[in-house]
Swiss-Prot record:
This is tRNA pseudouridine synthase A. Formation of pseudouridine at positions 38, 39 and 40 in the anticodon stem and loop of transfer RNAs. The gene is truA. Its EC number is 5.4.99.12. Substrate binds at residue 113.
């Protein structure tokens, strides 16, 4: 038995999320099918983060155990060839042979996410499924200042899905930066782990600050209320990217 670490990139627009689901097109299902086509084994891959439908990744990490100790280039080339043949918008960026002690989910110490907002009057013609389009002008500086109220260890009940299965709403948010680059606004988030819909909830609430409807104090009060009803709208999945996992 040999364990391998896979680093993946994918456009989540046409997938029902990462997790394998019967009769639905998922990222996990597509990669496991590629593994079966290559090795003849029905294997389950373990991932660092189970992204939702429509969410993208540029640095997703997974691990898989093969019976045979294949050369990493053989795995890399074979999986990408099958994914390309099947028309999947998934790429294996890197394959590494790793110790059995490595676990893509449990060994992760930090997860990095990016949320992209296109802030202009004209709608996106090319990247409609890869950004959140907001035509109303946003004050990115105000959004960034307000976002700092969320950094640190908090009960994030306000900013998690009502269907979140995490045992505790307490998380330590290490970074939440907001930066404008031309017509785009980028939200950068980093933590050991996140709650379901947490970053999309941040994005929707910070949008309220950006248009001037909320102040930084309003955002802070929403956090301390620990009440899902106090959250702003949940931003669409199209703008969210898992960019990196640290071990």
């Amino acid at each position: 038995m040999a364990r391998f670490k896979l680093t993946l990139e994918y456009d989540g627009s046409n997938y029902a999320g990462w997790q394998r689901q019967a009769e639905l097109r998922t990222v996990q299902g597509a990669v496991e099918q590629a593994i079966f086509h290559f090795s003849g084994q029905q294997l389950t891959i373990t991932t660092a983060g189970r992204t939702d439908a429509g969410v993208h990744a540029t640095g997703q990490v997974a691990h898989v155990d093969f019976e045979k100790d294949w050369h990493v280039n053989t795995i890399h080339n074979a999986l990408n060839a099958h994914l390309r043949q099947q028309g999947d918008n998934i790429a294996i960026l890197n394959v590494e042979n790793i110790p059995d002690s490595f676990d893509a989910r449990l060994s992760a110490v930090k997860r990095h996410y990016l949320f992209k907002i296109l802030n202009r009057r004209a709608p996106p013609a090319l990247n409609a499924k890869r950004v959140w389009w907001l035509p109303r002008p946003l004050n990115a500086d105000a959004m960034h200042k307000a976002a700092q109220k969320l950094v640190g260890k908090h009960d994030f009940t306000t900013f998690r899905s009502a269907h979140c299965q995490a045992k505790s709403p307490i998380r330590t948010l290490e970074c939440l930066d907001v930066q404008r680059e031309g017509e785009e606004i980028f939200l950068y988030a980093r933590a050991r782990s996140f709650l379901h819909h947490q970053i999309r909830s941040f994005a929707g609430s910070l949008m309220e600050v950006g248009i001037g409807r909320w102040t930084a104090q309003d955002l802070e009060e929403a956090l301390h209320a620990k009440d899902r009803a106090r959250c702003g709208m949940v931003a669409p999945p199209s703008g969210l990217y898992l960019t990196q996992v640290d071990y």
